[in-house]
């Protein structure tokens, strides 16, 4: 089985489609206390907080996978105009939403009636 196509563009060359509707995938992640202390110390001296960067990357992956699952359940062939939205719930919790438009490919009838 092929993986459902997710794109940030509005058009998919060679694939006309009909809109099914909006679709999204959500996740909220947090790091453990020990890592939060380490991140707090890193925040004092500056620089990238790699644990939080990794958490956000993992959160985006989870959100996109849930987006794909939800679109598939709607009967979609693809999701167009996919975007991310992120927000902090607390100092150590981050939510990520992946959202877009679920679409179904239109198969054009190429047969002609010469009768």
UniProtKB/Swiss-Prot annotation:
- Species annotation: Lactiplantibacillus plantarum (strain ATCC BAA-793 / NCIMB 8826 / WCFS1) (Lactobacillus plantarum)
Which branch of life, at top level? Bacteria
The record's family statement is: Belongs to the UPF0145 family.
- Pfam families annotated for this entry? YbjQ_1
**InterPro entries from the UniProt entry:** UPF0145_dom_sf (IPR035439), UPF0145_YbjQ-like (IPR002765)
Protein name from the UniProt record: UPF0145 protein lp_2083
